[in-house]
Amino acid sequence: MTLPNKAALVGLAHTLSEQVKRYLVTADETKSPEDHKLCIEGERTPSSTEHAQAWEIVRTCDRIGSLVHGPVPWLLSNALSHLDSACLAAATQLNLQDIIVDGPSPTSLDTIVTATGVSEDLLRRILRGCAQRFIFEEVAPDQYAHTDASKMLRVTGIHALVGFSCDEVMRSAAYFSNFLQQTKGKPPSWNVPSPFSLAFDPTKGLFDYYSTVDEVRGRRFDLGMGGTEATKPLVEEMFDFSSLPEGSTVVDVGGGRGHLSRRVSQKHPHLRFIVQDLPAVIHGVEDTDKVTMMEHDIRRRNPVRGADVYLLRSILHDYPDAACVEILSNIVTAMDPSKSRILLDEMIMPDLLAQDSQRFMNQIDMTVVLTLNGKERSTKEWNSLITMVDNRLETEKIWWRKGEEGSHWGVQQLRLRK
C-alpha cells in the first residue's frame, strides 16, 4: 500500500477542523425553526450556506479517505459501491425499518428471521452492509437498533425514493455502457432509447412504462417524487406572484393534477391558472373558479397565446437539450413579447470544477441521465440552452428564496427581447 502524502494529510486535517468550526457557527445562527421550511418528519431544510458548508466537510472527508486508503483500494471501493445499494434495497424490500424497534431495547436477529423468513446468514450480511453506512446499528452481537438515517425509511416518501433509487436507477446504471455503445455516445433527442428503456422495455420511456406496463413501480415513483418536493423551496417563496396584475393568466405547463396551481391560487386569488398535462394525468380533476385543467402535450405548440406567465416546475430536467429546445420553442411561439414571461423553476447547479462539485447533485444529475436522458444544468448550461431556443429569448432575472440567493434552486425568468 502506498503511504499517504503526510503534508497533504495534515493540511486536509486542518482544513476539516476549520470547516467544522464554520459549519457549527452557521448552524448556531439558526435562531428558530421558522428560519427554515420544515420538511419531512421535522427535518428542516438547511440554509444554502449551511448546505454548502456541510458538503465541503463531506468532500474533505472523502479526500482524506482517498489518501489513507491508497489509489487501488479507493478505486475498488468505488467500483463496488453498488453493493451498498444492494444491501439497502434488500433492507427496504424486507421492511427492516418496521421490524427493528425504535426504542430503548434493540431487536434480536432471531426476531428479524421470524418476521422475514430470511436466513440468519443473509440477514447478518445485509445488515452489516447497511450498518457500515450508518443505516441501522449492531449494538451487541445479533442485536440491532435504528440510526437517524434508518428511521427515515419509515417515512413513506423517503422509503419510496430509496426503493426507486435501488431498483430502477441501479438497474438502469447497469445498462449505461450498453447505452453508450448503442448510441455511440450521442444523446437521443427524447427519452428513448435510454439506459432505463434498455433495462425495462426498449420501446418505452420511464413515464410511458409506468403508465402502461408497471403501475406498481409508477405509484412508488410518484410517492418518491412527493418526498423530494418537500425538500424544495416553493415557487411562491421565490417568485412574487403578487407583482402580477389583476386577472393575469398563469399557464402551469406539465402541471400534473394541479396541486401547485391550486395552492398558489389560494394565496393569490387575483390570478387565473391553466394547468396543462396529458389526458391520462388530468383525468377526473375538476376545474375550480380559479384553476382550469387543459389537455396538452408539451411536444405541440402551446394553445394558450399571450399568457402573462408560462410556468414549468421540474419539467426540463427530465429531457435532453434537443427536447428542451422543442418544448420551449412551443411556448415561445405563443408568447406576447410585450408581457409574456417563462418561469423555469429548476435546480441550478453551480459552475465548478468537477472535483469541487457536490456529489449528491451529481447523483441527481446521473439519475435523470440514466432514467430519462435528462440533465440537471448549471447557469452556463441553462444560458446555452436558452440561446438555442430563440436568439430573442434571454434570462432577465433569477428569483431565489429570501436568504438563499445563489443556492442550487431558483426560478429563472425568461423574456423575449422586443
UniProtKB/Swiss-Prot annotation:
Family indicated by similarity: Belongs to the class I-like SAM-binding methyltransferase superfamily. Cation-independent O-methyltransferase family. COMT subfamily.
Protein name as it appears in the record: Sterigmatocystin 8-O-methyltransferase
EC number: 2.1.1.110
Membrane-spanning segments: none
Domain of life from the UniProt record: Eukaryota
SUPFAM superfamilies, per database record: S-adenosyl-L-methionine-dependent methyltransferases, Winged helix' DNA-binding domain
Pro-peptide region(s): 1-41
Function comment: Involved in the conversion of sterigmatocystin to O-methylsterigmatocystin (OMST) and dihydrosterigmatocystin to dihydro-o-methylsterigmatocystin in the aflatoxin biosynthesis pathway.
Residue pairs linked by disulfide bridges in the UniProt entry: none
Pathway: Mycotoxin biosynthesis; aflatoxin biosynthesis
Record-linked Pfam families: Dimerisation (PF08100), Methyltransf_2 (PF00891)
InterPro entries to which the protein is assigned, alphabetical: COMT-like, O_MeTrfase_dom, Plant_O-MeTrfase_dimerisation, SAM-dependent_MTases_sf, WH-like_DNA-bd_sf, WH_DNA-bd_sf
Keywords, sorted A to Z: Methyltransferase, S-adenosyl-L-methionine, Transferase
The keyword Transferase belongs to this UniProt entry's keyword annotation: yes
Binding site for S-adenosyl-L-methionine: G254, G255, D277, D297, I298, R313
Residues the entry annotates as binding substrate: M170, R171, S172, A173, A174, Y175, F176
Keyword Methyltransferase: yes
Reactions catalysed according to its record: sterigmatocystin + S-adenosyl-L-methionine = 8-O-methylsterigmatocystin + S-adenosyl-L-homocysteine + H(+); dihydrosterigmatocystin + S-adenosyl-L-methionine = 8-O-methyldihydrosterigmatocystin + S-adenosyl-L-homocysteine + H(+)
PROSITE patterns recorded: SAM_OMT_II (PS51683)
